[in-house]
């Protein structure tokens, strides 16, 4: 929740192909877009991924809600995105592994990944996630 990175996050999310790929729909008008991103950062655990001081990606842990729309304690949804010029370098795998290593025990992390997104599936597998059903994967922190 570092507001010092807000400008860098806004710049990262200016890449529409990136935001569309992860299902993040933001307002087109700049002022509304910045406010929406600010709200998103405030409501979730957002960690930026930096390379040589530049923000090249982000990892998000969000509260997980069950089928009835009720928040489930100790369950989180993992979301992540990385600038396309940084793909296939192990950067996101490393970032997620670092985050998982500092999480407390007895947490379940869910991730939604399109079945056609093989790169992202490989990241999840390398980070210990197991395929659940449909587009859902999960990892239990013991």
For every predicted segment, state its role:
Residues 38-43:
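Short loop/turn motifs at secondary-structure junctions and domain boundaries
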Residues 1-19, 46-142:
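Acyl-donor (CoA/ACP) binding surface of acyl/acetyltransferases
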Residues 17-37:
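Conserved GNAT-fold acetyl-CoA-binding loop/helix
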């Amino acid at each position: 929740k570092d507001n010092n990175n807000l400008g860098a996050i806004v710049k990262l999310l200016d890449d529409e192909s990136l935001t569309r790929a992860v299902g993040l729909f933001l307002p087109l008008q700049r002022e509304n877009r910045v406010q929406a991103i600010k709200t998103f950062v405030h409501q979730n655990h957002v960690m930026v991924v930096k390379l040589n001081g530049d923000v090249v990606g982000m990892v998000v842990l969000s509260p997980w809600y069950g089928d009835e729309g009720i928040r489930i304690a100790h369950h989180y949804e993992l979301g992540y995105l990385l600038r396309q010029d940084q793909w296939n370098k192990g950067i996101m795998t490393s970032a997620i592994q670092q985050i998982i290593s500092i999480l407390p025990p007895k947490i379940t992390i869910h991730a939604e990944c399109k079945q056609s997104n093989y790169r992202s599936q490989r990241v999840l597998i390398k980070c210990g996630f197991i395929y659940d059903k449909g587009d859902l994967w999960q990892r239990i922190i013991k």
